A protein has these predicted regions:
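Short beta-strand-to-loop capping motifs
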Residues: 39, 132-136, 168-170
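Conserved active-site segment immediately N-terminal to the catalytic lysine
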Residues: 15-26
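Active-site C-terminal subdomain of aminotransferase-like
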Residues: 25-107, 121, 190-192
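Catalytic PLP-binding core of fold-type I/II PLP enzymes
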Residues: 1-16
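General beta-strand structural signal in soluble alpha/beta enzymes
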Residues: 1-4, 22-24, 154-157
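A short linear hydrophobic-aromatic micro-motif
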Residues: 115-119, 151-157
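Conserved PLP-binding catalytic core of the aspartate aminotransferase-like
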Residues: 116-147
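PLP-dependent enzyme catalytic core of the Aspartate aminotransferase-like
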Residues: 149, 158-192
């Protein structure tokens, strides 16, 4: 089982390795308000405890060809546009390469920085969300505020971790990551 919300469609995935993949579409696929479920047939069961509501039973949706309720047509339309874009631009292999390049730009800077510190060990790093820290919580807040003033929104870290976080999902172009690194370099030069 895997929640792949952050990495769904960011790279190829062998779905045969999973019994169930769930993904909220709001990261890489479309607007918030829809989820995608890929489930192995043997896990679509009828023998669930009575307290599980009808809507939360995967069999309900499988039997109704995913049309148990009125679908979110706008999200489906937008997702379709994303699928067309991915197919027209090299598929998931090409997207994986672009995402690797973007993440490398940011991680290379963080690994060389004397001011900022990458929050995650190299072998565990995400290509979609890059958490990092400045020397202090107060400095993190100042970096986030300065970044916002410079046009870089939502750099504040996740509420459970703190620090800073750059979300560089599929829609973020490499040029956007390079611009962020330029901003961080300038900020570091002005504060060391």
């Amino acid at each position: 089982m895997a929640d792949q919300s952050s990495l769904f469609l960011s790279r190829p995935c062998d779905v045969s390795k999973y019994g169930l993949i769930w993904a909220g579409v709001q990261k890489n696929v479309g607007p918030a308000g829809m989820s995608i479920v890929i489930i192995r047939e043997d896990l679509i069961r009828e023998d669930l405890p009575e307290f599980v509501p009808t809507y939360l039973r995967y069999k309900t949706h499988a039997d109704a060809d995913s049309l148990y309720n009125t679908p979110n047509c706008w999200s489906i339309y937008c997702c379709g546009k994303v699928f067309q874009y991915l197919l027209a631009n090299g598929g998931l292999e090409a997207m994986a390469q672009r995402n690797e390049e973007k993440a490398t730009v940011l991680y290379d800077f963080l690994d060389r920085s004397q001011f900022f510190t990458a929050a995650v060990r190299k072998e565990d790093r995400s290509l979609m969300n890059v958490p990092f820290f400045s020397p202090s919580k107060e400095q993190d807040a100042e970096v986030a505020a300065s970044a916002k003033a410079a046009g870089f929104d939502n750099l504040k870290g996740h509420k459970s971790v703190g620090g800073l976080r750059a979300s560089i999902y599929n829609a973020m172009p490499k040029e956007g990551v390079e611009a962020l690194v330029d901003f961080l370099k300038k900020y570091e030069a002005e504060h060391t």
